[in-house]
């Protein structure tokens, strides 16, 4: 592959040419301050993210999946977002899939040459049976990773909504995707180390995207996380607290409703606020496509 000297993310940072000579306090301050630029880059990408959220919510309402694709740090960040959807929003695990160049072993160590294989990118999309109802999120700091670009092309050809996240303007990945999310973070404090603010920007963008999608899919009531899956003691207490906050019920009533709803915060809230039993609350929620507001009329 020819050396690419034009990518913003590969340029030496002009403010930190003497980084190795910094005292420890200055070094830490420089690294921390540069991370703040990641959040600003995501804010600038707001319109594209909003477009991605609207398009994704529409497909997911019809039963589609979220498919995350990337190599190295970008792939691991996609995997992280995918696995957090189930405990946070009770999103079905089978509807969140992460494809990482090099497969599962690339989670723990670099797999030589994996990101350079266009064939593997296209093959992984085919093996996942990606189709028109799916939303495919493709991440690459450079925006030119062959595995990820080929996956984008294959997913788009299959009719999926493709959303590309890259940290360099004019990146091939952005051109290959239906929705282009440019996270223009510029040079890194450590030249070319895109696990720093480029990766941070990708993480913030994924947090923003998936959280906004779940709000649109009625996984949040007010600003309360009402579709949380109470899978440990901490989350059991959170479910109780959320039920009390949303319904105004006391602890005993909230506990009784949660017991009757088998731990479903949404169901318990509708039961308490509407004064109905669990089957009736479930029917109301189903008719309202999971919306508590809709179920309460």
Residue positions per predicted region:
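Short, basic, glycine/proline-bearing loop/turn elements
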Residues: 34-44, 110, 135-138
């Amino acid at each position: 592959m020819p050396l690419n000297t034009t990518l913003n993310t590969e340029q030496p940072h002009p403010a930190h040419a003497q980084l190795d000579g910094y005292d420890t306090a200055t070094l830490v301050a420089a690294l921390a301050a540069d991370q703040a630029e990641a959040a600003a880059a995501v804010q600038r990408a707001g319109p594209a993210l909003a477009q991605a959220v609207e398009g994704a919510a529409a497909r997911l309402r019809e039963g589609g999946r979220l498919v995350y694709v990337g190599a190295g740090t970008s792939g691991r960040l996609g995997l992280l977002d995918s696995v957090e959807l189930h405990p946070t929003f009770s999103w079905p695990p089978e509807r969140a899939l992460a494809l990482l160049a090099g497969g599962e072993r690339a989670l723990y160590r670099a797999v030589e040459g994996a990101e350079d294989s266009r064939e593997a990118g296209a093959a992984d999309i085919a093996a996942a049976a990606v189709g028109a109802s799916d939303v495919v999120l493709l991440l690459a700091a450079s925006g030119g990773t062959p595995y990820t670009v080929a996956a984008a092309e294959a997913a788009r050809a299959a009719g999926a909504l493709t959303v590309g996240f890259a940290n360099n303007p004019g990146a091939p990945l952005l051109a290959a995707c239906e929705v282009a999310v440019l996270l223009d973070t510029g040079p890194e404090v450590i030249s070319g180390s895109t696990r720093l603010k480029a990766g941070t920007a990708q993480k913030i963008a994924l947090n923003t995207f998936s959280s906004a999608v779940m709000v649109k899919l009625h996984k949040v009531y007010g600003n309360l996380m009402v579709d949380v899956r109470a899978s440990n003691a901490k989350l059991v207490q959170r479910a109780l607290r959320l039920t009390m906050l949303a319904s105004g019920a006391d602890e005993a009533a909230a506990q009784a409703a949660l017991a009757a709803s088998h731990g479903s915060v949404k169901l318990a809230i509708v039961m308490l606020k509407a004064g109905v039993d669990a089957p009736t609350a479930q029917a109301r929620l189903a008719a309202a496509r999971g919306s508590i507001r809709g179920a309460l009329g």
